[in-house]
Amino acid sequence: MNHLGNVKYLVIVFLIFFDLFLVNGRDVQNNIVDEIKYSEEVCNDQVDLYLLMDCSGSIRRHNWVNHAVPLAMKLIQQLNLNDNAIHLYVNVFSNNAKEIIRLHSDASKNKEKALIIIRSLLSTNLPYGRTNLTDALLQVRKHLNDRINRENANQLVVILTDGIPDSIQDSLKESRKLSDRGVKIAVFGIGQGINVAFNRFLVGCHPSDGKCNLYADSAWENVKNVIGPFMKAVCVEVEKTASCGVWDEWSPCSVTCGKGTRSRKREILHEGCTSEIQEQCEEERCPPKWEPLDVPDEPEDDQPRPRGDNSSVQKPEENIIDNNPQEPSPNPEEGKDENPNGFDLDENPENPPNPDIPEQKPNIPEDSEKEVPSDVPKNPEDDREENFDIPKKPENKHDNQNNLPNDKSDRNIPYSPLPPKVLDNERKQSDPQSQDNNGNRHVPNSEDRETRPHGRNNENRSYNRKYNDTPKHPEREEHEKPDNNKKKGESDNKYKIAGGIAGGLALLACAGLAYKFVVPGAATPYAGEPAPFDETLGEEDKDLDEPEQFRLPEENEWN
């Protein structure tokens, strides 16, 4: 309990809780691996290798011929020299550095040519002079300054020496400059007079370090057995960084509304790379769940409403013409003796038996000429003019007199689609007095039932009566072809408009030409440059003074 009062104790407990429950529960994306660091043998990759051979007098001719040159040849045999791998540079140094194989030359990329040049050192170069390692390292730095080396290639320097350089400080300075520019330096010591501490320090190994992969030494007799493991250790030492690849597009969210997850993947290029990641996604807010509403039950009526003739009758819509009327069903109980045809002669029944059947006027047969309906108008022409909403359709010309209606009551039965025109012969039956008074009136026949345009005279009627060989099928009159007449009128109007425009343009052209020759000022645009004022005057008027030039003529000068 005393620990609870200690602030430091509480802080430590909070940090432990934060590390266990919060830090370990971080998002998965924080553990994504996008880059991999790995080690690879440099000898199989792009490398610019600089081989520096000590040719000082301390090596002696015997060791040069039997050990030093064969050591260099064995080292080159282990290298992969080609355009896309290792490029070789070789120089020998004694008093000064001498270039043997130039970097990026043919021998630098061809192992056979490089071995021929190294084998020639047995006869062309003999050990002599001092150990000028500083000049040899300076030649390597010049390649970097002149950008002779490849930018994407690893830079490796391998030194074969048997002793201590002339200037230790200068050699260390040059080695530090190369190391700062990313160049690795490896030293292979040969013989009994080598300085192990200096060589380890030259390659960057601290004296307290145990094993140094960039340094190895051997006696002259065992040099061929040591160079192989040494070069393998040097090649493995190079560390590289590789990218794990590009991610694919995100997948759609796992839900259509609310919170869900989405993921994306990529191809694994190296071991240890992350291949798939997930993250949360949120879509639009989900709508509320549908729930059925509680609908109260309606109580049924104890006494249902009666249906039948006493139910409410729906009134028919006005101004609607039935092109196919149905004949009213006859009532066998009423009017058996008065109406043998079965039609209801009651004009205004108080209670119609069937409200769905439209009101029909009685149809009087032909033999009942004495019975005249009470609703026959005195002037049938006025009645015909009121029925203007009924569309007109011509009837066949071959209708005979027997097919014509004999009763005015049939007029109200709609024909499909044009009712027959009231003729004078029907007026004769309905109103005999009017026929007697108008004795000069023309009595039409069945031929006059055809529809005619306005303005037709009686000559055409007589022609139709004279020649009865009319075609059986009715022919449409010119006024019954509105589409053809309309097209013909439109084409005639187009020609008229085009002719008017052409005539107007011709008149304008003639008026312009006339105006050009009649009015002098109209020809001004077609004239050349205006002549000077003196040139327009005559010879006798050029010497006149300005007041005399503009003086009005005297009375005697007008003639």
Curated annotation (Swiss-Prot):
Which residues are noted as glycosylation sites?
A: N132, N310, N460
Could you tell me at which residue positions the Isoglutamyl lysine isopeptide (Gln-Lys) (interchain with K-? in Factor 3(A)) crosslink is annotated in this chain?
Q77, Q78
Listed SUPFAM superfamilies: TSP-1 type 1 repeat, vWA-like
Those parts of the protein on the Extracellular side are 26-496
Acidic residues biased stretches: 536-547
Tell me, in one coarse class, where this protein mainly resides: membrane
Disulfide topology: C244-C273, C253-C281, C257-C286
Compositional bias (Polar residues) spans? 431-440
Region listing for Disordered, in residue ranges: 280-496, 523-559
Against PANTHER family, the record matches this protein to: ANTHRAX TOXIN RECEPTOR (PTHR16059), LYSOZYME (PTHR16059:SF25)
Query: What name is this protein filed under?
Result: Thrombospondin-related anonymous protein
